[in-house]
Amino acid sequence: MLNAFTGAQVRAAEVPFLDAGHGNTLMQKAAHGLFLVAFEMLRSAGHSANRSSAVVLVGSGNNGADALYAGERLLRRGVSVTAIAVADEVHSEASEVFSRRGGRVLHLDQDNLPDLAARAIRSTLIIDGILGTGARGGLRGIAAELISAINTGAGERSVRSLLVVACDLPSGVDVDSGELSEPVLFADATVTFGAAKTGLLVSGGALAAGELNVVDIGLGMTTPGADTAVEPAMRRLEAHDVAALYRRPQVGDHKYTRGVLGVAAGSAQYPGAAVLATGAALATGLGMVRYLGPPAVATIINAVHPEVVCSTGDVEDSRSQAWLVGPGAVEDDDQARRARGAIASGLPVVVDAGALSEVPERVESSVILTPHAGELRTLLATRGIDVARADIEAAPARFASEAAQLTGATVLLKGFTTITAAPTGEVFSQAEAPPWLATAGSGDTLSGILGALVATLAEDDGVAARLGLPAGATWAAVAAAAALIHGLAGMRAAESGPVVVAGLPPHIGSVLADILA
């Protein structure tokens, strides 16, 4: 599990080391980690050191010093390195070490801005060391002009071979929310120090960061049981976490003990949503899927998935461990009634799409809402909070958490990064899904995966403990696991080209086979 922290948490963790005079030690560890990633990027791209050039963009703070020290290490390996100082003053000791190694420090001004921007664009590698975790807001003044010029010039190149690595975080990315303040130089990789920052796991920050590399500089924030350990502000599940929470079939199991998921989905207008959701649930592994809905939809489902037990009954008459309601269920009074019954049943329930409007003011955390940004906007508006969809997309963790605390539900907010938030404050962010999954029906398959996990774990009180999480994070962790499985299945499907979500179930099974191996 990847734990992420706010900028304030990381800075607070550094204070004892700085007070003890170990600031330079932390800086050298950070710089070395940055150098290793930058040098490996050059090597992996086929660039030899003595034929490569790098430009280090240097701000006034410690972030700029880290970048300069990394640049000095590149010089040792034979890379030609130039530093562009965007501030009047930069870290004097780092600048001196860099210069002694043969590096040039050029101070940016209006006269040389075009030439220095062109130099950066022509280089093999740029290290962005302008703003760090202590910065608030985006780039200003001449630094902003430089990045804008680089972005414009790099975009005009016929083939973008320029590599960019960000030092701690890309300049212009909010360290906590991930919101972007333009201009931002998007990175191929970000090397962050001490621990991951929440802004690098969500929203535009994750997109701008590229591949995330965390360098351990000895703060001990993520060491279990240590005095220096800190409660994460955000988490990201990894494959081994899914293996820990997934319920494997046991000797003596039968279809009822393996988990029964009731599904009230689909309508005359959108029958396919029910087919996709039930298929994904079956592929995830459980004892039985019971479908409640229109006979015409049931006929289609049974033609594709004959093992699904279909009826036109009500929730109260159906034996299930959990419910999935809402996918494709629009303008259907019977499906709306079933959604209300499932939400009121006291059983865990996944509430998607058309059923979101049936959620009462307050529910339990075992009610998992799965809106996209537009649906979350509507849900918040009905509770007196007026927010634009664009604002939700810019700061998804903030608004998913707000919705969870407002309703008492667990909230899974779909998007480029999938955010799950518990009403007790725990937040997860998953980013495995490829852009190919941004297609109709993708959310239906995600809800089916989640429904199956919820049904198999409905009577399992040990999920949180197995993951080392607070009990209140149980359903948020299960939702994050569903997002991870969905994303990895999408990645596997995308290996052969555009993704058709109807073909996703076999990939769900193969992903789980690898995870559980």
Describe every region a protein language model picked out.
Residues 90, 142, 183, 441, ...:
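Short acidic-hydrophobic sequence patches enriched in Asp/Glu that either
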Residues 119-124, 184, 317-319, 343:
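A short, aliphatic-rich alpha-helical micro-motif
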Residues 1-86, 198-353, 357-368, 373, ...:
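Small-residue (G/A/S/T)-rich helix-start motifs and N-terminal tracts that mark the onset
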Residues 124-125, 130-232:
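Internal gly/pro-rich beta-alpha loop/helix module
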Residues 92-94, 117, 176, 300-301, ...:
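Short Asp/Glu-rich motifs
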Residues 90, 111-113, 169-175, 198, ...:
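Short acidic loop-to-helix transition motifs that present clustered carboxylates
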Residues 36-132, 138-167:
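Nucleotide and nucleotide-moiety/phosphate-recognizing core
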